[in-house]
């Protein structure tokens, strides 16, 4: 099936006839569902433009979503043990193209990513998503319940996929021809988990901004808090001052890539001297920092080492520090970090952040419950069955260091003894300059992995379309196109993001808004 069918539209005459048969099939579908461990909650026809009913969705997960296309929506519980279950949804679109896709979660999971379901359904994918086994972005449900933790660690996406595929085969006479995965952040970790643990689940996996080094990422939140101190510390750095620090880092590193565009193309080539911001007696404290504060900045922007001297987690991306200030540099331990230690590592509601030490980080890594770390570089089974892995990470990510994605790529290269040209056959990783966490940012970050980063003004910039073209037509992406949008939604410029290990350099002759004036070197 050609990729152009992703955007095909049914003829008006055929649509009316299809309406009755599609709605009837949906109305009768609940009576046909008989799948082990599945309790159907509802089956409903939803017309394009209709608001998605969320009566049974956890309140913290409710969001305003309008169906992008006509679809049959199935909500259900999937039992995973006698102490755990998943809330799941399957969206089965009228404009079905013979493709199935599973979506992932975010943060500490807890919510079905309905916007991702809607995005995939819009392009004719039968799609499924789960809540990861609990309600809301919290770790409290893991307390004294290892089964719920197992769902979050690895089980939820796989079980949801198994059920989603069965529903797809039941609903559509033709079944499905190809299966895909789409996820970012925690969803990126889940994508890598699938590649490593369930290599036969998908033909193509899109995993973005992945929290795959999960345990050490959690502990990194504590390290950053310790590095920057409490809010009442006389040398505490406010969010406003972090903005000043950010501007100085960009000033020092912007031209390293050859273009003065306000973007650090690749943080690996940035080596800012923070001490240049130390007050000299003629500047005030709102535009400069003290020597003690400079030391804190350098510590916060350095690698996180465990007690044995090994790197647990790489440094924060230069260029993302201003946004990180609202997460990691608040004077309190990052909430997800504190919850993980309280409800998982120590399994003790009385534990508090003041008790954290480097030994705590060591203990957390040794526990690695249900191998939640998705850092296993041996992905030969996925490669050998013909799977394709497309990964991306924003270089302005304030939550998860993009360097971690580079480290994993190198681990795979070493484990498989494979050169980049050999990895290119099945695994391609793209650095997205100016992208924040899974989107946003100051650069050409609209790469089309969801409604937040897709624009109909550039329909070819669509990660699902890119993956379909690679899996089904053998056309692998040489670069990742991304758009920078104006406030009114128009395209300001496009940039061709490089396939790692190459990086972008502005070589002209045009200015930085000309995509052909950049070279991957």
UniProtKB/Swiss-Prot annotation:
Q: Where does Ca(2+) bind?
A: 254, 257, 259, 261, 263
Note the coiled coil stretches, chain numbering: none
Q: What is its main location?
A: secreted
Tagged with keyword Transmembrane helix: no
Residues that span the membrane, as ranges: none
* Family of this protein: Belongs to the tannase family.
Provide the protein name: Probable feruloyl esterase B
Q: Which organism is it from?
A: Aspergillus niger (strain ATCC MYA-4892 / CBS 513.88 / FGSC A1513)
Q: What is the lineage of its organism?
A: Eukaryota, Fungi, Dikarya, Ascomycota, Pezizomycotina
Q: Gene for this protein?
A: faeB
């Amino acid at each position: 099936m050609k990729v152009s069918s992703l955007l095909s539209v049914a003829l008006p005459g055929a649509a009316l006839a299809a309406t009755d048969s599609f709605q009837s099939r949906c109305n009768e579908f609940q009576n046909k569902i008989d799948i082990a461990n599945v309790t159907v909650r509802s089956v409903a026809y939803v017309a394009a433009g209709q608001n998605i009913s969320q009566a049974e969705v956890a309140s913290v997960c409710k969001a305003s979503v309008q169906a992008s296309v006509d679809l049959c929506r199935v909500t259900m519980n999937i039992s995973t043990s006698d102490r755990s279950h998943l809330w799941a949804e399957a969206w089965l679109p009228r404009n079905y193209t013979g493709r199935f896709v599973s979506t992932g979660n975010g943060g500490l999971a807890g919510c079905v990513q309905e916007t991702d379901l809607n995005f995939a359904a819009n392009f004719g994918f039968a799609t499924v998503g789960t809540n990861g086994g609990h309600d809301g972005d919290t770790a409290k449900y893991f307390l004294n319940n290892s089964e719920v933790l197992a769902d979050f660690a690895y089980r939820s996406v796989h079980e949801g996929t198994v059920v989603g595929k069965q529903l797809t085969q039941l609903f559509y006479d033709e079944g499905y021809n190809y299966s895909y995965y789409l996820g970012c952040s925690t969803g990126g970790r889940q994508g890598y988990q699938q590649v490593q643990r369930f290599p036969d689940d998908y033909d193509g996996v899109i995993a973005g901004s992945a929290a795959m080094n999960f345990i050490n990422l959690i502990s990194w939140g504590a390290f950053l808090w310790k590095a920057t101190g409490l809010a009442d510390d006389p040398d505490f750095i406010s969010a406003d001052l972090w903005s000043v620090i950010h501007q100085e880092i960009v000033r020092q590193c912007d031209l390293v890539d050859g273009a003065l565009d306000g973007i650090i193309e690749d943080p690996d080539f940035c080596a800012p001297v923070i001490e240049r911001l130390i007050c000299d007696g003629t500047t005030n404290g709102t535009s400069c920092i003290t020597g003690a504060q400079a030391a804190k900045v350098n510590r916060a922007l350095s690698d996180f080492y465990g007690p044995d001297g090994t790197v647990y987690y790489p440094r924060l991306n230069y260029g993302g520090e201003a946004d990180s200030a609202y997460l990691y540099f608040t004077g309190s331990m990052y909430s997800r970090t504190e919850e993980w230690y309280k409800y998982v590592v120590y399994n003790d509601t009385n534990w508090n952040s003041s008790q954290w030490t480097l030994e705590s980080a060591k203990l957390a890594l040794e526990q690695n419950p249900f191998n939640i770390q998705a850092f296993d570089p041996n992905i030969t089974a996925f490669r050998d069955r013909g799977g394709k892995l497309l990964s991306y990470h924003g270089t302005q990510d304030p939550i998860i260091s993009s360097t971690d994605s580079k480290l994993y790529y190198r681990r795979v290269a070493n484990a498989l003894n494979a050169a980049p040209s050999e990895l290119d056959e099945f695994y391609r990783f793209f650095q997205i300059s100016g992208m924040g966490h899974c989107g946003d940012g100051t650069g050409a970050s609209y790469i089309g992995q969801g409604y937040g980063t897709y624009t109909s003004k550039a329909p070819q910039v669509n990660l699902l379309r890119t993956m379909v073209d690679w899996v089904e037509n053998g056309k692998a992406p040489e670069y990742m196109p991304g758009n920078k949008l104006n406030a009114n939604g128009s395209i300001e410029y496009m940039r061709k993001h490089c396939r790692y290990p190459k990086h972008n350099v502005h070589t002209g002759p045009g200015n930085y808004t000309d995509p052909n004036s950049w070279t991957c070197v």
